[in-house]
Structures are given as structure tokens and as C-alpha cells.
């Protein structure tokens, strides 16, 4: 069984990581159900295990070092953070590449419900859209596994302040931009998006 939790207040990043680490231990011990946690953070940058100082352009917000994969990214209001704590071993899916592909299919299917064509790129993790002839990232992935239980997850840009990205080179990728559902002409309340996320989740997972 997969539990769903929606936090309406902004969640401190370190508190979120601590909560995830406690939860995945419980899942591994079979003392808790899997969890999909939907939330938002206050404005901040996170630095994954591949992050380098060269990707910091201007320190507009606090930077948190984190154990997830990837480089620097931004989190803030208007972005739907999706933290997934899933037991891949119990699901007989002990394959990180397959997990990333499943996450990608899920978010692509969600975007399709809003007439947004999201695409997966083998060499650039995340979900991409073509906006006025330019490839831009609309969803960033950063995952970690412990004993085949996943944590961290996805940041989907719904209506964030995109100017907040100017302090970093997102995911260390030069020459690519970021976009949001709002910039693509789709204005959707988070509550409506959450319903679609849940519905489409069970088609993949």
C-alpha cells in the first residue's frame, strides 16, 4: 500500500530530509507503508553529489548539500515537490534506470493531461519541453536509494518564480533553460494537479 501526504505549508529542507530518512528506515523494516509526499519548499538551492562550485552564479538563496543524485537545482513556492519513498525490492524492480524511466513516463503522462508535450532524454535526466524552439526543463529529478528504498524525487515547475533560477546553472547544463506549466500557458491549482498525479501514478506504479 502507498500512502499519500500533502503538506500545504512550506517545508524546511533539512526537516524534509530527516523525515524521509526516518520513513525509509521504517519502510525497510516493514513497519510503515510506502509514501508519496507532495509539498513545497521556501526558496533555496540544493547541491547534489555531482555539484560543483562553478554552477553557482549568484547565491540568492541558502544552499543545502544533499545526498541525492545530480548537481544544483532550485526549489521554491509554486513548484510541486514530489518525494517518493518506494520499496523497489518488494516491487521486484531493483533497477535504477527502470525506476527513472517509470518516473519519466509518469510525469510525461501527467503533463499530457494539460496538453503539454513532455519528453525524456537519455543524456539529460528530467522532463523537457520545446518552448519557442528552445529545449527547456520543466521537471527535475534527483533520487537516492537505500537498501532499494527510494527517497528524494521530482520537482515539477507549476508556477514558480523562474527568475530564481538565475543564481545557478540548473543541473550544470549550459545552454538549456527552465520553464513552467504557467509559462506554457497552463494555470492549474496544485490541488487539481495533485489529483492527476495520484491518478496517473497507479497506471505506472
Swiss-Prot record:
Keyword annotations of the record: Acyltransferase, Cytoplasm, Transferase
GO biological process: protein modification process
Catalytic activity: octanoyl-[ACP] + L-lysyl-[protein] = N(6)-octanoyl-L-lysyl-[protein] + holo-[ACP] + H(+)
Residues annotated as the enzyme's active site: 171 (acyl-thioester intermediate)
One Pfam family, short name: LplA-B_cat
Gene Ontology molecular function: lipoyl(octanoyl) transferase activity
Annotated binding of substrate, by residue: 68-75, 140-142, 153-155
Pathway: Protein modification; protein lipoylation via endogenous pathway; protein N(6)-(lipoyl)lysine from octanoyl-[acyl-carrier-protein]: step 1/2
Keyword Transferase (UniProt): yes
Main subcellular location: cytoplasm
Note: In the reaction, the free carboxyl group of octanoic acid is attached via an amide linkage to the epsilon-amino group of a specific lysine residue of lipoyl domains of lipoate-dependent enzymes.
NCBIfam families tied to this protein: lipB (TIGR00214), PRK14341.1 (NF010921)
Entry protein name: Octanoyltransferase
Source organism (scientific name): Wolbachia pipientis wMel
Name of encoding gene: lipB
Amino acid at each position: 500500500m502507498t500512502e499519500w501526504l500533502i503538506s500545504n505549508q512550506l517545508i524546511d529542507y533539512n526537516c524534509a530530509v530527516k523525515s524521509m530518512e526516518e520513513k525509509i528506515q521504517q519502510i525497510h523494516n516493514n513497519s510503515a507503508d510506502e509514501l508519496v509526499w507532495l509539498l513545497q519548499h521556501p526558496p533555496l538551492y540544493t547541491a547534489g553529489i555531482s555539484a560543483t562550485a562553478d554552477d553557482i552564479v549568484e547565491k540568492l538563496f541558502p544552499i543545502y548539500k544533499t545526498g541525492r543524485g545530480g548537481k544544483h537545482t532550485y526549489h521554491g513556492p509554486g513548484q510541486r515537490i514530489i518525494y517518493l519513498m518506494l520499496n523497489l525490492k518488494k516491487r521486484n524492480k531493483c533497477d535504477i534506470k527502470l525506476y527513472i524511466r517509470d518516473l519519466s513516463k509518469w510525469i510525461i503522462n501527467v503533463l499530457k493531461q494539460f496538453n503539454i508535450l513532455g519528453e525524456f532524454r537519455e543524456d539529460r535526466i528530467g522532463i523537457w519541453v520545446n518552448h519557442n524552439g528552445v529545449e527547456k526543463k520543466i521537471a527535475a529529478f534527483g533520487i537516492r536509494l537505500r537498501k532499494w528504498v527510494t527517497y528524494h524525487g521530482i520537482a515539477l515547475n507549476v508556477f514558480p518564480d523562474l527568475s530564481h533560477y538565475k543564481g545557478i546553472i540548473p543541473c550544470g547544463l549550459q545552454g538549456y533553460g527552465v520553464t513552467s506549466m504557467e509559462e506554457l500557458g497552463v494555470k492549474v491549482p496544485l490541488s487539481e494537479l495533485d489529483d492527476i498525479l495520484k491518478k496517473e501514478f497507479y497506471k505506472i506504479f
